[in-house]
């Protein structure tokens, strides 16, 4: 028997109800983000065409995302992305999700940066701190001679950081190290 085609409005309702039942605090917002993530539909498009049919494949993907979020998996681990300092960063279960309050640290670091300085980001995770400092210094202050090192004990975290560096076009030396064990003295 063929499954009934669901509309954007119906899918969103299914998502909000399920997340609310499971005690997700921002159930409405999370259901919306996941709908947008899966379908690519903007809020303007949603409100213009709430009865637009959603493909069976996208409906299944959305329901799977809702199930994962209902199991309290962080939204960013489901979408694989978190914005930090205005840049998109890949994230997964091997790294901490970049937090907006950490942006203050980056903003303060940028204020003290001078040409030819080196930045060491210990326990780098996604690399968001070192990458944001270097990228913003390049774009805002034209400091292209800065060097960055991102160190982490986890090779899985370093894979994420390398991908973020590649996506942002920022060269950083990535080192697998338990704190300072393999950090060169300079």
Please identify what each model-predicted range represents:
Residues 103-186:
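Conserved SAM/SAH cofactor-binding pocket of Class I
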Residues 23, 27, 42-43, 74, ...:
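Secondary-structure boundary/capping signal
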Residues 2-54, 58, 62:
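A short N-terminal interaction module
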Residues 6, 29, 57, 97-100, ...:
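Residues at secondary-structure transition points
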Residues 19-23, 39, 70, 113, ...:
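Secondary-structure transition/hinge residues
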Residues 33, 82, 176-178:
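A general secondary-structure junction signal
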Residues 36-111:
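Conserved AdoMet
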């Amino acid at each position: 028997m063929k499954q009934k085609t669901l509309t954007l409005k119906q899918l969103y309702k299914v998502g909000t109800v399920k997340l609310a039942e499971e005690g997700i605090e921002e159930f409405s917002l999370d259901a919306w983000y996941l709908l947008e993530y899966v379908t690519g539909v903007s809020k303007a498009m949603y409100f213009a065409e709430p009865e637009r049919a959603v493909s069976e494949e996208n409906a299944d993907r959305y329901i799977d995302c809702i199930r994962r979020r209902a199991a309290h998996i962080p939204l960013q681990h489901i979408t694989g992305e978190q914005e930090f300092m205005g840049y998109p960063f890949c994230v997964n279960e091997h790294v901490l999700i970049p937090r907006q309050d950490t942006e203050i640290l980056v903003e303060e670091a940028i204020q003290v940066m001078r040409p030819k300085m080196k930045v060491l980001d210990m326990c780098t995770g996604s690399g968001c701190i070192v990458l944001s400092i270097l990228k913003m210094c390049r774009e805002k202050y034209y400091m292209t001679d800065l060097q960055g090192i991102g160190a982490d004990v986890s090779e899985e975290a370093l894979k994420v950081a390398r991908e973020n560096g590649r996506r942002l076009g920022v060269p950083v030396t990535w080192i697998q190290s338990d704190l300072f064990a393999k950090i060169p003295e300079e």
